[in-house]
Each structure stands twice: as structure tokens, then as C-alpha cells.
Amino acid sequence: MAKPKKSDEEVSIDSDSLKIKVAKEAAKLIKDEMVVGLGSGSTANLFIQELGKRVIEEELYIYGVPTSFDSRMMANQSGIPLISLDQCGEIDIAIDGADEIDKKTFSLIKGGGGCHTMEKIVDYYAKEFVVLADESKMVDSLGENTPVPLEVIPFSYSTVLSKLLKINAAPAIRSGSGKMGPVITDNGNMIIDVFINIEDAEETETMLNSIPGVLENGIFTKCDKVLIGTSKKVEVLKK
């Protein structure tokens, strides 16, 4: 007899449980007197909650650097004291999620929540950049299922679209929910999602950022460690 397929709800529950498992492990990486980059997104939010428990229960002395208004609110709710990037001097570790991770290179795509510019600044500035995900996010080739988000200055959106079409990419302006019109980032800019062939992630990252009007793109190539939640355990992958 064939094994019955899981419903979408069951798959979602499994994914959520793996994210929680990974978030708990990531919280154990944080030590007293660390400055911690706080990523954005569902997995990063779970990490922030778990870290907040340690701050309260163990009186862990740390500061967090948020990467979005959303992560700022979650940190405030979780009891994590915050510090700005220009105040902290350096960031010991940044913990963030991902939308897609290349199995071979650990290059990744982020930005489903439209926060990738601030995330990349904090993640790249940190001494160590750790990514959290469940095993469904691992892919053989980056960009298989997920478009690369570009944060674009509104003044230049039409010229950016034209340039992307000329290089055989497939761009689309991201629309908002709860309001008419495009998504507007925390920085006041637009998001263009683009499907593009990624043979070399570093080259594509640099090329997209060279387009006038593009503030930052969602390809990240400087991950140091990946924590992957599986049904059996949390796997720690290093370059």
C-alpha cells in the first residue's frame, strides 16, 4: 500500500517544528557580552524568542542589532536590549534565515520579507554569519525556485526593469498586501523580484548591484555556517 501524502497543514507543522529545533540550537551559540545581529523572517523570529528566554532566565548580558522594524519589535517583546550599528563598534555573530541555500557553496537567497539590504549590512559586518533553515531550503542550484529580490530606488524602477530584460532576466515588481501598489521597504524603496540564471553567485551578486538604481540584491555569499533542521537532528554545516 502506498504511503499517504501529507496534507499542506501537516507539512507546515513539520516545517515549523524543525525551525523551532534549529532556533533553540542557535540560541546556544550566544555567550555573555556578545553583540548579536538579529535577522528577519519567521526562522529568525523564533531564534530571537529563544534568545530572549536565555536573556531573562540566565541573565545573559548581550546586545542585539536588529535588521528590520519587524526584528526590532520581536526583540523588544522578547526582552533583548538593542543597540544600533553605529553604536556597537563590531558584531560578534549574526543569526539569520534563508529562502534558498546552495548545497555546495552555501550561497543563499534572502529577502522574501523585503529586508535584505539591512540584513546584508549586518550579516556581512559580523565576525561570524550563521544561517538557520530546515532541510527543504537546501537546493542543488541557487535560484531554482526562488527569485532574487532587488531593493530599487523608486526614481529608477523603469530603467532597472529595462536593464534586467536586456540581460534575459524575468523581473516583476513586488505588490503589497493590505494596500494597493508595490511593496515599500523599511528604507522607502521598491522591491523587484527577478528570476535569473545564477552560474556563479558572487559574480551575479556583483553584477546586479552594478545596475544603477539597485540599492542591494538578495544573493548572500559570505555565510560561515549553516544549521539545518532535519527530522533526526540539527546538522551543522561549515565551509
From Swiss-Prot:
GO terms for biological process: D-ribose metabolic process; pentose-phosphate shunt, non-oxidative branch. Its EC number is 5.3.1.6. Substrate binds at S40, G41, S42, T43, D96, G97, A98, D99, K110, G111, G112, G113, K137. InterPro entries: NagB/RpiA_transferase-like, Ribose5P_isomerase_typA_subgr, Ribose5P_isomerase_type_A. It comes from the Archaea. GO terms for cellular component: cytosol. NCBIfam families: PRK00702.1, rpiA. PANTHER family: RIBOSE-5-PHOSPHATE ISOMERASE (PTHR11934:SF0). This is Ribose-5-phosphate isomerase A.
